[in-house]
Amino acid sequence: MKTVVAAAAGDAGKLGVAERLGIQSDMVVQELGWDNDVDDDVRAAIEEVIGSDLLDEDSDDIVDVVLLWWRDQDGDLVDTLVDARAPLADNGVIWVLTPKTGRDGHVEPSDIAEAAPTVGLAQTSNISVSDDWAATRLASPKAAKSKR
């Protein structure tokens, strides 16, 4: 059973997003695909939980989690997932954050479902992280089985 640390009432929503993403203190998290449209509250909540800044695309560190902000016009998802997977620890996960249905840049869930196995990843869950963004969890099949 997980132990959840209580937060002040005003912080509960934003800190909860990091918990829903499975992000814990001292994890190393890399952010890819940042642009002006990302949800800064989601970013701030994750940074607060991990106790450091998110690593950018130029980092060479091994990471526990990759946050990939992805929009329909961003190019080839398979190529980007190959790049995102490179620094990932063996049991690491990639969260593909996409604009929700009806929002500019919305990505069809089938696009993610088709791209994931091409690069050796399994889609394991989907969650809402904010009013405008949804997240899809991708992991290696070995990591996916251990989290079920």
PLM region spans:
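S-adenosyl-L-methionine-dependent methyltransferase catalytic core, i.e., the SAM/SAH-binding region
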Residues: 1-148
